[in-house]
Amino acid sequence: MRTISINDPDDPRISGFRDIRERDLTGRQGLFIAEGEVVLRTLLSDASLCRPRSVLIATNRIDGLRGLLESVSPGTPIFAAGQDVLDRIAGFPLHRGILALGEKPVARTVEAVLADLPEEAVVVAASEIGNHDNIGVLYRNAAAFGAAAVLTDDRCGDPFYRKSIRVSVGAVLRMPGAAAPSLAALIDALEAARFEVIALSPSATEPMNGLEPGGRRALLLGSEGPGLPASAMARTRTVGIPMAGGFDSLNVAVTSALGLYQLTQRQA
């Protein structure tokens, strides 16, 4: 394993890592930042759908992460910098001490992703979930419960936003995903692929615990607050989570976990 020393935060070789927070907002043209040891392990694993372009590590972390760094392919440069230089490159104190610049997978259509799935599959479908933490949690929950893909509409946040990747614990990097041009188009594609679309809503009269696992199912979730539009719920099977008096909804992280458990559990 060979590292390349960086002593100048303006070194052009690490330009992709510079001013991270500003580029979070402006975009990286097909690239993303993977932050921290756990996420980098996923990026470098065989399960990853993405590949690293370069790695940047604090010099005081090299010995502790040597095993991980040795799994980086020889053609991928590993840059090393002192903590003060690393912080100046990133534009803020970088406590995790390791970053990777990765390449997003080639974008696929929702139809193409669905065409690859088996006859029995559960997918997560999301509409108007713009919060980066929530997008990350959806991917994490989808991976944890064995869902086959995460599908979104055009009003959802980018799963390759740095914080979404971190919150997902790297699940974004290995979970198939795609975005539809609208919620209506997303439901159209699911129906055409013979998925039963199940929407979660506080207004539903059918309880979620009546759902049985099996077949092709899509768990459709909307934003916290407004939820799903009536036009979408009219096209779906709508179920709710029974709650104690005074409460009618949960956040999307908990709701998605409960829904996925219900759809993926197997009876003994």
Question: Which residues fall in each region the model found?
Answer:
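Conserved beta-strand scaffold positions in the cores of enzyme catalytic domains, especially
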Residues: T3, I78-A80, G177, V197-A199, ...
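Short glycine-rich anion-binding loops that position phosphate/pyrophosphate groups of nucleotides
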Residues: E37, N60-I62, V85, P105, ...
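Short beta->alpha connector loops at strand-helix junctions that form conserved
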Residues: A81-G82, S127, D153-D154, P176, ...
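N-terminal positively charged helical leader segments and presequences
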Residues: M1-P93
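Amphipathic alpha-helical repeat scaffolds
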Residues: G36, G130-V137, L250-T255
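Active-site/ligand-binding-proximal alpha/beta "capping" segment
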Residues: I198-F247
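Structured adenosyl-cofactor binding patch, chiefly the S-adenosyl-L-methionine
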Residues: G97-A100, N141-F145, P159-V172, A230-A268
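RNA substrate-binding interface of SAM-dependent RNA methyltransferases
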Residues: L101, V110-A204
